[in-house]
Amino acid sequence: MSRIAFLLVLVATTAGAAAEQVVVDFERGAMFSANDKANRFPEWVEKGVVFRLAHEPRLSKAKGLLMFFTHLSTGRRGIVCAMALEPIPVRATFPKPARSVTVAMWGSTGVPAVLEAFDEDGKLVDHASLPSAPGRKAPGDPVPIFTMTVNAPRIAYIEFSGPREGEYLVADELRFTPN
């Protein structure tokens, strides 16, 4: 009888561990490089999730880069496309497929927000969007942080996008549940 109880406990804890949510918060990211210039980089890896632009710039020969951006009210860091004149979706590729992904974001006033989930074949499997990110209610208010979630059986990567030229959309935190 004790072997059966042991096996049940083992199965329950293994199943629970597999379903634990993983949180990526970008707090390890450096805001500035050694020479005090804005820290721009082609790729960021945290907790096995690889962040990079979905494609290279098409309107210029510039190298596509990401950067960290600080939410002034909270001091938290987020990741954003560093290409102000050519907004490019930011892609986050998971080390193993996920079944649910939630991204906390904030952005320019009125910026549209799109979150798309893709499987390992590049097929769109879920989509969430807002025509306009929530804005401040008064000039002294902090920029609101909002969340978007996508769900599908085997999400290989997500992309977040929406900004037009000169706008920004920052991922403040990414939470995913592996399969």
Question: How would you describe each model-predicted region?
Answer:
Residues M1-R3, A17:
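Terminal and domain-boundary regions
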Residues A12-E20:
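Bacterial Sec-dependent signal peptides at the C-terminal "C-region" and cleavage site
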Residues A19-N179:
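Surface-exposed, well-ordered secondary-structure segments
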